[in-house]
Design a protein with these regions (language model features):
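Metal-ion/cofactor- or nucleotide/acyl-coenzyme-handling active-site neighborhoods
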Residues: 1-170
Length: 170
């Protein structure tokens, strides 16, 4: 069995029918505001690790706490939330740990570029320290919008140094 796959949020993952392929991995990692419902054929349903950026998790959106039960009802095998950031935690992670029923990992990285790195980039860095081989799907380094909707401004990837991230990954 393949060990680990990281599912990116770019729309280039659609219409490829990768759902079964993805679900056959031992570790399936998704991040931030990923969606499963209506995308099962292309994205599968398995999620063993959910990577979130620190801000999404700790600001007023409280995304992890507010969405954990929904995510657990739509996916299989969720065992861990991984919060990745270049920001310093000021006690927020411990507060969140008391509110949820899965394991949380918090990892802070030194900023690799002048601008904020994407959560996907930080996830790749984190996972490569754990798995010697990492399969990536759904990454196009800012060429498309998120797969789950192209209609709202919040669906457009933020300002990141896509070229630098792509060069680092290549």
């Amino acid at each position: 069995m393949n060990k680990c796959i990281l599912i990116g949020n770019s729309s280039d993952i659609l219409n490829k029918g990768l759902g079964s392929y993805i679900d056959n991995f031992e570790n399936v990692v998704r991040f931030n505001r990923f969606k499963i419902k209506n995308f099962e054929k292309d994205l599968g349903t398995k999620c063993t690790h959910w990577v979130l950026n620190y801000k999404l998790t700790t600001d007023s959106r409280n995304y992890l706490v507010k969405n954990l039960q929904k995510i657990k009802s739509q996916t299989t095998d969720l065992k861990q939330a991984i919060i990745l950031t270049t920001a310093e935690d000021k006690g927020e992670i411990n507060k969140i740990k008391k509110q949820i029923d899965i394991d949380i990992i918090y990892k802070r990285f030194k900023p690799p570029f002048d601008s904020k790195p994407t959560t996907g980039f930080l996830a790749i860095k984190y996972l490569l320290d754990i798995f010697p081989h990492l399969t990536l799907v759904g990454f196009d380094f800012g060429k498309s919008n998120h797969y789950w909707g192209n209609h709202n401004i919040s669906d457009i990837p933020g300002k990141h140094e896509w070229g630098k991230e792509k060069s680092y990954i290549d």
